[in-house]
Amino acid sequence: MSLYGGIPTNLVSGMSSAGAICTTQIRDAREREKREIGLLNDRLADYIEKVRFLKAQNHVLSHDIEILRRGFSGGGHISSFFESEISNCTVISERILSSRTKFQADITGLEGEIEIYRKKWLEALKVVRSHREDHHVNLDKLAEVEAQIALFNRKIRIVEEDVLRIRRETGGIQNDIGRIHSQIHAEIALKNERHHSVQMLLQRVQVIQTENSSRIEQELIYIHRDTTLENRDYFRQELQAAMRDIRANYEAMSIRSREDIEIAYRKRIDEIRVIPAHVHIEDYREELLSIRTTLSTTHSRLAEIESRNAWLLTTITDLKHQQAEEARIFEATLDAKQATYEQFKERCTELSIQMEKLCDHETSLQAELERYRVLLNGANVTTYVSNSTGAAGYRSSTHVATTTTTTTNGYSSGYTAGGYTSGGYTTGGYTRGITAGGAVGGISTGGYIGRSSSSHGISVGGNIGGVSVGGHINGYHASGDISAAGRHHESSYSYSSSNN
């Protein structure tokens, strides 16, 4: 039941449904974004795990290379050991290539998913904006409905007042006709007097209304002409003062009218008490009580309406502030989501760059392994010495032949160096040396193989990834040195053998 004449009001506000729909969609969007962020975090964890696995594989390869560097002893069986290590490295390289293909496929799928999520995010923005427009439309409709409700309530109050007035007049007329015929002329005179006073009051009200309308129009014209802040404050203060004066005048007039009515009622009661033939005092008392009850009810209803009006104004202000706060929070949340998306995008870019670096490093490792294979093939040098011993320790002939095949950056070349020595004298010979060098994946390789005619021997030297290898071989003595120098450690290995 409403407060206006006991008539039920069943009006449903459109703002609740629109707000519920908007809140539900925002909550669904947040849940969907949380799930998508969780999936992206899982994928990022998988990528980090794969990168750590590749780092571990790289560490294993580095350890194997270090073992190969430290385990060089110059024996003839080193080739099998290198071949096994090369096969293991080939398997690991193939595994890395397969992982690379898989990672590239994952990156492609992730880019597609990122594009899909971006489209979904843009669609969500469009939906939110459309709902915001619907919300404004619903607010406009709500304002219109509330204005209509206020208009209908005012009309209802006017009708109720008319009904009460008509009932009072009808009851009074019936009582006057049935009970007091002798006071008809007095009542008619009083009625005419009251009517005349009402007409006078109406005329005064019309005059005041006309004056106020003209003043308001003049003030509006003045306001439109000059709208500075000081004039607005002055107009507001004057308006508040005028409203206070009007309220004070209204209260004074209401008090005077109430006193006049009470005086008239008292006079009427005294007149009724003076009449000896009157026997309906109880009816008048009941009527007076009903009038007082109606008056108190009207006052209480007016107080309730004023309190409800104040509550509605406060509620409207709170809703406006709440809407502004929610809009600000929503914009801040969208900015945070955009920043998170940019961070994920940067992380994906960094992962792609790391993958490219790993692929480049893998290519460098393959090139280094190929270089090791070339050096191992070059280490298989066939050297043989044929001696024919005569009388008195006479060395009749010595022949040393060296065949070397060198592959550098995909280019193969060969040479043969040999000489013939008789009786300790050099009768003829040919000496040739070659220097090969290059850089593969940050590892420098270089070597020198030649024969010195003055020392009657073969000198072999090289540099592989910071490992220096050198040696000299002749008919009586073989010596060599292997040294490795790096950024973090240094190591060397020397061997020597004599053949008497």
From Swiss-Prot:
<feature type="region of interest" description="Coil 1A">
    <location>
        <begin position="37"/>
        <end position="68"/>
    </location>
</feature>
<feature type="region of interest" description="Coil 1B">
    <location>
        <begin position="82"/>
        <end position="219"/>
    </location>
</feature>
<keyword id="KW-0175">Coiled coil</keyword>
<dbReference type="InterPro" id="IPR039008">
    <property type="entry name" value="IF_rod_dom"/>
</dbReference>
<dbReference type="GO" id="GO:0006998">
    <property type="term" value="P:nuclear envelope organization"/>
</dbReference>
<protein>
    <recommendedName>
        <fullName>Intermediate filament protein ifc-1</fullName>
    </recommendedName>
</protein>
<feature type="region of interest" description="Head">
    <location>
        <begin position="1"/>
        <end position="36"/>
    </location>
</feature>
<dbReference type="GO" id="GO:0005882">
    <property type="term" value="C:intermediate filament"/>
</dbReference>
<keyword id="KW-0963">Cytoplasm</keyword>
<dbReference type="GO" id="GO:0031507">
    <property type="term" value="P:heterochromatin formation"/>
</dbReference>
<feature type="region of interest" description="Linker 12">
    <location>
        <begin position="220"/>
        <end position="237"/>
    </location>
</feature>
<feature type="domain" description="IF rod">
    <location>
        <begin position="33"/>
        <end position="383"/>
    </location>
</feature>
<keyword id="KW-0403">Intermediate filament</keyword>
<dbReference type="Pfam" id="PF00038">
    <property type="entry name" value="Filament"/>
</dbReference>
<feature type="region of interest" description="Tail">
    <location>
        <begin position="384"/>
        <end position="496"/>
    </location>
</feature>
<dbReference type="GO" id="GO:0005635">
    <property type="term" value="C:nuclear envelope"/>
</dbReference>
<comment type="function">
    <text>Cytoplasmic intermediate filaments provide mechanical strength to cells. Not essential protein.</text>
</comment>
<comment type="similarity">
    <text>Belongs to the intermediate filament family.</text>
</comment>
<dbReference type="GO" id="GO:0090435">
    <property type="term" value="P:protein localization to nuclear envelope"/>
</dbReference>
<feature type="region of interest" description="Linker 1">
    <location>
        <begin position="69"/>
        <end position="81"/>
    </location>
</feature>
<dbReference type="GO" id="GO:0007097">
    <property type="term" value="P:nuclear migration"/>
</dbReference>
<dbReference type="GO" id="GO:0005737">
    <property type="term" value="C:cytoplasm"/>
</dbReference>
<dbReference type="GO" id="GO:0005200">
    <property type="term" value="F:structural constituent of cytoskeleton"/>
</dbReference>
<feature type="region of interest" description="Coil 2">
    <location>
        <begin position="238"/>
        <end position="383"/>
    </location>
</feature>
<dbReference type="GO" id="GO:0005652">
    <property type="term" value="C:nuclear lamina"/>
</dbReference>
<dbReference type="GO" id="GO:0051664">
    <property type="term" value="P:nuclear pore localization"/>
</dbReference>
